[in-house]
Amino acid sequence: MRIIITGGGTGGHIYPALAFLKYLEKVEPDTEVLYIGTKKGLEAKIVPQAGIKLKTVDIQGLRRSLSPQNLKTAYKFFKSVSDAKKIMKEFKPDVVLGTGGYVAGPVVYAAAQLKIPTIIHEGNSFPGITNRFLAKKVDRIAVGFHAAEQYFPASKTTFTGNPRAQEVADAAAQVEKFEEPTVVIFGGSRGALKLNNAFIEALPELAQRSFKTVYASGEIYYDDYKETFNQYKENSNLDIRPYINNMTELLAKSQLFLGRSGSTTIAEVTALGLPAVYVPSPNVTADQQTKNAQEYVDQGAAIIIKDEDLTGQTLVEAISNILENNEKYQEMQAASLKAGVPDASQRLYNLVKEISK
């Protein structure tokens, strides 16, 4: 198979694509892969590091308000469509897969015009503007949240979950749990100021509880709190770090997650059957993180603390109410396991094969 994958800007569009490619390499080792992104997006760094060939087009996002910049965006869109067609005529893909982000717009659009089989993967519960635009033009639509199905034509939409779920589930298969109940608190790669402030407030209480806390402040914040953190460095209940490098292994060993509710994070957490306390970021388009988390609250696998309601007290209470209540913990764990999709890449692969024949 020859496949072009496109998607970028943020990790939520890129990591699922890379997870799928990892699976594809395993089931079809002879697959030829080309990734199309932008020079400015996160993909420009991450994709080559993964050993995948990258080509770029020059495109920018559409402003949601009236702006002269949108004229420039329109010009760049059609120029990128033309550039993408040239790349495809040279590469001759059997299928083109878009995982979201504005770069996927012109690339998948170009593929559809060339009558190349196309599929998009929507990772969030509320679709982004690019995938909403592409929905009528593609052959298949894969979604990572059941809530997203309502926004797309039912005849070509399939729930597959997020490919990161299968990557995490496979990697964690042989990992043993910590002996003591453990919660991982993580505000993302850069950290989250509101979460840090609540954690500092909660430290005296967390130091005395019956569970262990692993906390990552984010590297840019760590030095600001280092003096306070050092006061607790001998406390066996607390493991405080600037960043968590081995997140998959750590989550697999733990019993509970507390943090933001990006689509990839939720896929990883549910693939492992972990209950979760989500604190949706208020700085995300269309309040996507709240919508993402709500689907799993409705299924009994998680609870939400609004960012504005997050304090040291609400943080400790939320964790304690789950980890120190065995019946509730087991109910949430079962719900999380049921909601998880540990075969997400296989499901997406089945769709790809279906349209590339």
From Swiss-Prot:
It holds the Pfam family Glyco_tran_28_C. UDP-N-acetyl-alpha-D-glucosamine binds at T10, G11, G12, N124, S189, I244, Q289. InterPro entries: GlcNAc_MurG (IPR006009), Glyco_trans_28_C (IPR007235), GlycoTrans_28_N (IPR004276). It is an enzyme of class 2 (transferase). Pathway: Cell wall biogenesis; peptidoglycan biosynthesis. It is a peripheral membrane protein. GO terms for molecular function: undecaprenyldiphospho-muramoylpentapeptide beta-N-acetylglucosaminyltransferase activity. It is found in: Cell membrane. Its EC number is 2.4.1.227. It catalyses: Mur2Ac(oyl-L-Ala-gamma-D-Glu-L-Lys-D-Ala-D-Ala)-di-trans,octa-cis-undecaprenyl diphosphate + UDP-N-acetyl-alpha-D-glucosamine = beta-D-GlcNAc-(1->4)-Mur2Ac(oyl-L-Ala-gamma-D-Glu-L-Lys-D-Ala-D-Ala)-di-trans,octa-cis-undecaprenyl diphosphate + UDP + H(+). GO terms for cellular component: plasma membrane. HAMAP family: MurG. NCBIfam families: murG. Belongs to the glycosyltransferase 28 family. MurG subfamily. This is UDP-N-acetylglucosamine--N-acetylmuramyl-(pentapeptide) pyrophosphoryl-undecaprenol N-acetylglucosamine transferase. The lineage of its organism: Bacteria, Bacillati, Bacillota, Bacilli, Lactobacillales. The gene is murG.
